A protein has these predicted regions:
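Charge-rich, low-complexity N-terminal segments
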Residues: 1-46
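Charged, low-complexity interaction tracts
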Residues: 38-153
Length: 153
């Protein structure tokens, strides 16, 4: 009987985790934070053995927090510049004669000195944080119903 309860709980976690994922994706699209689409494609839901993990690509948390100077300095400058170079391809800007390289250099320098503008403004709470309370409540309610409705004896 406990295995049956455990499987029902895992099913609830998978269901609610996927709803959470859809809400996060919707928030990313609504806030226009989807330049390359890599972050949206990276979000995964893993529910097994009564555990739920929702995860995404490295630095997913930066969508709400921005990048601090400390975090930017943890990366090699050339690595950071290369990441900015790749990201800049999705910006609606035309670069000619090495301007993309200068842009990448300047943005990388700025990140290491001041952090991103989002970080400087204190971050935001409308990508994933605002959906967490509903996720926890829905899981709690549904798991509670499973326990109440299961006759163990």
């Amino acid at each position: 009987m406990p295995q049956l309860i455990g499987q029902k709980v895992t099913d609830v976690l998978a269901f609610e985790g996927n709803i959470y994922k859809l809400k996060v994706v919707s928030n990313i699209l609504k806030t226009k934070k989807n330049r390359s689409g890599e972050t949206v494609r990276s979000i995964r839901v893993d529910a097994q053995n009564q555990d739920l993990i929702v995860w995404g690509r490295e630095n997913f948390h930066n969508m709400e927090t921005g990048i601090s100077p400390v975090e930017a300095k943890q990366n090699d400058f050339a690595f950071l510049k290369a990441k900015i170079w790749g990201w800049s391809k999705y910006l609606p800007l035309d670069f000619t004669n090495g301007q993309r390289a200068k842009f990448s250099f300047n943005v990388s320098n700025s990140l290491r000195e001041k952090g991103s503008l989002l970080f400087q403004q204190g971050g935001r709470k409308d990508i994933y944080s605002n959906e967490e309370e509903a996720l926890l409540k829905n899981i709690s309610d549904k798991v509670g119903q499973i326990i109440v409705n299961t006759q163990i004896l």
